[in-house]
Structures are given as structure tokens and as C-alpha cells.
């Protein structure tokens, strides 16, 4: 009889170990910045995913405000709170070493989301959930190059230079350009992901008398800013082709209206679901992939209505 009781107690304790772990699970999330359109969709989707679990999973969101030191401090705070897992959207993809070390030393699972650290040799217990930014640049530029007939001048609106999404999207663009020697880069400058900055840069280029046939933007926000600058300058819609990345609601609307020729859909829900699901599995000691890739998809006038 005592043996049966012991087995029953063991089974009950195991049940509580797994069930209560989910009900009481707390995940610390450090976002590079709250004041970013696409990252807002990512954060909201994370929250929705966490609430979708039967018992719910508690997320503690922190805003790093584009400050590397602040982000590290947030991660160290998560460690001291003994959270069950940590999710980080890094401010600077070249400055993640101390974040990784802090989580690994504490034995807390770490998931990097949306932005993959520059150091690809991540230790056990550290996973990335992202999309291949090289493909995004390749997809937007290939579509543009074909629409341009393989010739003309382009300007490139770069994102934050501390972010390897900027580097890789632009690298993808330039890889495609090697097949089109008659397409030249007239200008490339950083608009730091901002609609206002994208608008200012394009307005400045127009004021300087620079001529270009297309604008290749690392994201939709800067692309929309470019479209606004061209419109204000009296340039006919569609005479300068514009490509973005993200597929935000504003970006989708711009494609539908013809302000943008093309965008590339970055799946905020897919990355959010993947990051939280992976963090939960790691906290429960379940096996996960070392890298989870969420595919990009091309957005054109012909298929824009299929995206939400």
C-alpha cells in the first residue's frame, strides 16, 4: 500500500512539475525599442501567443530604448529575478556576447528574436528565431530589376547600421545587382528605419538634383517616407519605383494604392509565435532547433489582398 502511495505521490509531483511550470512560467522580454512600427506588431503578437496557452504564460516586457547598456542591465535583472526564460530583440547584433554569457552562466534559456547575433556560434541553451534578411534584399531587388528592364539608377535607404538586418538586406540587394551591370547605385544612406528620415533623405536628393529610377528601402517605413517625398515634389506616382520590406499594414496599403511597387512580408506573428513557443519548450527542457527560420514572402499588387 505504501508503495502505491509513493508512486501516486511521484506521479502527482511530476504532474505539478510540468503543469505548474507552465501556469507559473515567467519570461523576460527585452525589446530593442518600443517606438518602432514593425517591432510593435512583434511585441503585440508575443503577448497574444503567451495568452493563448491554457494556463497562460507571463511576459515581462522591457524597452531598451536603443541602448546596449540598458539592454544588458535588463537581462541581468531578469537573471536576478530567476525568470524561466529570456527573449531578446537585440539593440546591436554585434554586442550580444555579454547578454549570452549572463543567461548561459545562470542556466536560463535565451532566445534571440528577429535579429540574429553576428556571432553565429551560439552555445547550448541559446536559440535564434528570425527570417533570412539576405533573401528579403534579393527578393525585392530581383523584382525591381525585372520591372526596370535591367537598367537605370537606384538609391538605397539603409536601416540602422548597428543592425545586421540592414547589412544582410543590403547585401542581398547588391548580390542581385551583380547580374545587372546596367543598374547603378546613385546614393545609399541610413534612414534608421524611420519614415520621417526616409522622407528627408529622398527630399534632399531631389533638391540636390539627383536622378534615380527606383528606391530600394530596407523597410516599409522608410519606403513610405520616400513615396511621400516624391509626391510632395510633384513626381508622378509609379514613375519612380519603390520597394520596401516588412509588409506592415501601412506597407500593404501603400502597395495596394500603388505608392510602393513591392514589399517583402516579414511575418511578425510567425517570429513571435516561434520565439515564445521555443522559450517555453526550453524552459520545460524539451528539445528545440538551434535556429528557427520564418520565411519571407513577396508582396505585389497581384497578391497584396492575401496578406493581413
Language-model regions, residue ranges each:
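A residue-level marker of the well-folded mature domains of exported/periplasmic proteins
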Residues: 21-308
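Gram-negative bacterial Sec-dependent N-terminal signal peptides
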Residues: 1-23
Amino acid at each position: 500500500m505504501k508503495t502505491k502511495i509513493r508512486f501516486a505521490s511521484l506521479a502527482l509531483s511530476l504532474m505539478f512539475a510540468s503543469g505548474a511550470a507552465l501556469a507559473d512560467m515567467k519570461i523576460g522580454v527585452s525589446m530593442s525599442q518600443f517606438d518602432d512600427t514593425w517591432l510593435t506588431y512583434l511585441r503585440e503578437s508575443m503577448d497574444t501567443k503567451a495568452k493563448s496557452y491554457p494556463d497562460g504564460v507571463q511576459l515581462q516586457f522591457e524597452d531598451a530604448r536603443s541602448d546596449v547598456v540598458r539592454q544588458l542591465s535588463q537581462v541581468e535583472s531578469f537573471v536576478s529575478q530567476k525568470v524561466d526564460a529570456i527573449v531578446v530583440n537585440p539593440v546591436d547584433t554585434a554586442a550580444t556576447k555579454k547578454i549570452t554569457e549572463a543567461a548561459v552562466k545562470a542556466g536560463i534559456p535565451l532566445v534571440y528574436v528577429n535579429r540574429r547575433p553576428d556571432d553565429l556560434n551560439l552555445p547550448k541553451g541559446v536559440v535564434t528565431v528570425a527570417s533570412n534578411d539576405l533573401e528579403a534584399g534579393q527578393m525585392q531587388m530581383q523584382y525591381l530589376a525585372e520591372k526596370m528592364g535591367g537598367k537605370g539608377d537606384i538609391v538605397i535607404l539603409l536601416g540602422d547600421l548597428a543592425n545586421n538586418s540592414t547589412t544582410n538586406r543590403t547585401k542581398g540587394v547588391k548580390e542581385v545587382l551583380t547580374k545587372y551591370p546596367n543598374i547603378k547605385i546613385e546614393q545609399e544612406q541610413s534612414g534608421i528605419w524611420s519614415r520621417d528620415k526616409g522622407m528627408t533623405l529622398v527630399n534632399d536628393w531631389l533638391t540636390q538634383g539627383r536622378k534615380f529610377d527606383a528606391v530600394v528601402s530596407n523597410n516599409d517605413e522608410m519606403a513610405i517616407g520616400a513615396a511621400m517625398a516624391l509626391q510632395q515634389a510633384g513626381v508622378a506616382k509609379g514613375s519612380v519605383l519603390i520597394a520596401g520590406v516588412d509588409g506592415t499594414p501601412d506597407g500593404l496599403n501603400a502597395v495596394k494604392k500603388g505608392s510602393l511597387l513591392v514589399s517583402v512580408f516579414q511575418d511578425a506573428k510567425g517570429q513571435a509565435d516561434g520565439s515564445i513557443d521555443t522559450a517555453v519548450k526550453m524552459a520545460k527542457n524539451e528539445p528545440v532547433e538551434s535556429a528557427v527560420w520564418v520565411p519571407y514572402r513577396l508582396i505585389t499588387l497581384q497578391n497584396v489582398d492575401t496578406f493581413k
